[in-house]
């Protein structure tokens, strides 16, 4: 008689994905972030659902409905701050997950990598629309500025912006549709994450050495379920500490003022996790050029499999590539800092240099480093 988990149609799928899945014996804690992202998504969907029960997507009542959640709903303040800071946690895990993929050459699984890029775009869209919903000053002006960028598209730009707005400015129609999209997108993300996992399990996981691990596999359960669980507890401990002690640290004070179309905030900026892309956008004086650079800053990830010149998959034994990788990480931190600064010297030139360096490292220096390392290996 076969074990139920191996024969039952539903349990069989779970079994193949999380229990009897053959996994490399040497994957490090950097491989924990996939499961942590799944946890983040579940936290966001659950907290978001409870917020949606009390939120109203109307320009007159949106701001006060968020205040009502925080003041009058049982543990509403906690749900609200879990959801707001959960977005930051999501992006921290997301960027670490992508960084791991770049460092260890996981992008060579092209289907998994490309679906990951689509997931990144979907998550960024969800995060942006969620930021608009509280209808504070930064919500309103952030929505106005970012959606208005589409007007840079030749010929159809203006019509496209008015179509997205549902009028001639960001108003009730915009807020209502943003709420609708913000509600549905996480479920699309969840479905895409399953496809992401499906393609990953076609090839099996990569490992820190970047070499085939078919000869040395271990079952996912109990080894990696336990390991992932440790990551979950550490993550939740850090997250709850942040939510309960520093809930407003990453928010913008301007968002505690209701949206006012007649009063522009001195510095319009998105949430911290978009600042690197915002800095790249601002570093180009031309509007259309900035929009193209903004999209390319994320889309450039799709070129990683094509630009891989090294004979070794992982960067573990490639010191030149390692230096470039950590330079890229530092460069992204500089871009994040610049994105939050006003457009004035010396921030303008720093942003422009950092933007050029970002694309140079990925498109030119990393492929060159791989080529040089191949030559050095032959000595």
Curated annotation (Swiss-Prot):
Cofactor note: Binds 2 heme b groups non-covalently.
InterPro entries in the record: Cyt_b/b6_C (IPR005798), Cyt_b/b6_C_sf (IPR036150), Cyt_b/b6_N (IPR005797), Cytb/b6-like_sf (IPR027387), Cytochrome_b (IPR030689), Cytochrome_b_C_euk/bac (IPR048260), Cytochrome_b_N_euk/bac (IPR048259), Di-haem_cyt_TM (IPR016174)
SUPFAM superfamilies assigned to the protein according to its UniProt record, in alphabetical order: a domain/subunit of cytochrome bc1 complex (Ubiquinol-cytochrome c reductase) (SSF81648), Transmembrane di-heme cytochromes (SSF81342)
Amino-acid biosynthesis keyword on record: no
Gene3D superfamilies to which the protein is assigned, alphabetical: Cytochrome Bc1 Complex, Chain C
One record GO biological process: mitochondrial electron transport, ubiquinol to cytochrome c
Pfam families per the UniProt record, alphabetical: Cytochrom_B_C, Cytochrome_B
A molecular-function term among this protein's GO annotations: metal ion binding
Topology of this chain in the membrane: Multi-pass membrane protein
Chain residues that bind heme b b566: 97, 196
Residues holding a ubiquinone: 201
GO CC terms in record: mitochondrial inner membrane; respiratory chain complex III
Subcellular location: Mitochondrion inner membrane
Keyword annotations from UniProtKB, A to Z: Electron transport, Heme, Iron, Membrane, Metal-binding, Mitochondrion, Mitochondrion inner membrane, Respiratory chain, Transmembrane, Transmembrane helix, Transport, Ubiquinone
Cofactor(s) the record lists: heme b
Keyword match Nucleus: no
Residues that hold heme b b562 according to the record: 83, 182
Membrane-spanning intervals of the chain: 33-53, 77-98, 113-133, 178-198, 226-246, 288-308, 320-340, 347-367
Description of how the protein assembles with itself and partners: The cytochrome bc1 complex contains 11 subunits: 3 respiratory subunits (MT-CYB, CYC1 and UQCRFS1), 2 core proteins (UQCRC1 and UQCRC2) and 6 low-molecular weight proteins (UQCRH/QCR6, UQCRB/QCR7, UQCRQ/QCR8, UQCR10/QCR9, UQCR11/QCR10 and a cleavage product of UQCRFS1). This cytochrome bc1 complex then forms a dimer.
Additional record remark: Heme 1 (or BL or b562) is low-potential and absorbs at about 562 nm, and heme 2 (or BH or b566) is high-potential and absorbs at about 566 nm.
Family: Belongs to the cytochrome b family.
Function comment: Component of the ubiquinol-cytochrome c reductase complex (complex III or cytochrome b-c1 complex) that is part of the mitochondrial respiratory chain. The b-c1 complex mediates electron transfer from ubiquinol to cytochrome c. Contributes to the generation of a proton gradient across the mitochondrial membrane that is then used for ATP synthesis.
Name recorded for this polypeptide: Cytochrome b
């Amino acid at each position: 008689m076969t074990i139920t988990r191996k024969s039952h149609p539903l349990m069989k799928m779970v079994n193949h994905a999380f229990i009897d899945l053959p996994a490399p014996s040497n994957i490090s804690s950097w491989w924990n972030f996939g499961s942590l992202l799944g946890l983040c998504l579940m936290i966001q969907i659950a907290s978001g659902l409870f917020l949606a029960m009390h939120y109203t997507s109307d320009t007159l009542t949106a701001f006060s409905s968020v205040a009502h959640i925080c003041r009058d709903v049982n543990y509403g303040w906690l749900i609200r701050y879990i959801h707001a800071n959960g977005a930051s946690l999501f992006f921290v895990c997301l960027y670490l997950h992508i960084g791991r993929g770049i460092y260890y050459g996981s992008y060579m699984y092209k289907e998994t990598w490309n679906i990951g890029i689509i997931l990144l775009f979907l998550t960024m869209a969800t995060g942006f629309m969620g930021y608009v919903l509280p209808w504070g000053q930064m919500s309103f002006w952030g929505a106005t500025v970012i959606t208005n960028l589409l007007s840079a598209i030749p010929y159809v730009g203006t019509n496209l912006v008015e179509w997205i707005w549902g009028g001639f400015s960001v108003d009730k129609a915009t807020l209502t549709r943003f709420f609708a999209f913000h509600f549905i997108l996480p479920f699309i993300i969840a479905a895409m994450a399953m496809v992401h996992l499906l393609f990953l399990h076609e090839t099996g996981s990569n490992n820190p050495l970047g070499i085939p691990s078919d000869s040395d596999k271990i079952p996912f359960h109990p080894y990696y379920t336990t390991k992932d669980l440790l990551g979950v507890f550490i993550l939740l401990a850090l997250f709850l500490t942040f939510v309960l002690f520093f809930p407003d640290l990453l928010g913008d004070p301007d968002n505690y003022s209701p949206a006012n179309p007649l009063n522009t905030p001195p510095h319009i900026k998105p949430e911290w996790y978009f600042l690197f892309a915002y800095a790249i956008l601002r570093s180009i004086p031309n509007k259309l050029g900035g929009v193209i650079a903004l999209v390319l800053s994320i889309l450039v990830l799709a070129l990683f499999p094509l630009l891989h010149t090294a004979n070794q998959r992982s960067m573990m034994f490639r010191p030149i590539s390692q230096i470039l990788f950590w330079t890229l990480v530092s460069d992204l931190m500089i871009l994040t800092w610049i994105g939050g600064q006003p457009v004035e010297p010396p921030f303008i030139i720093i942003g422009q240099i950092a933007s050029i360096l970002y694309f140079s490292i990925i498109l030119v220096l990393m492929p060159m480093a791989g080529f040089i390392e191949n030559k050095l290996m032959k000595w």
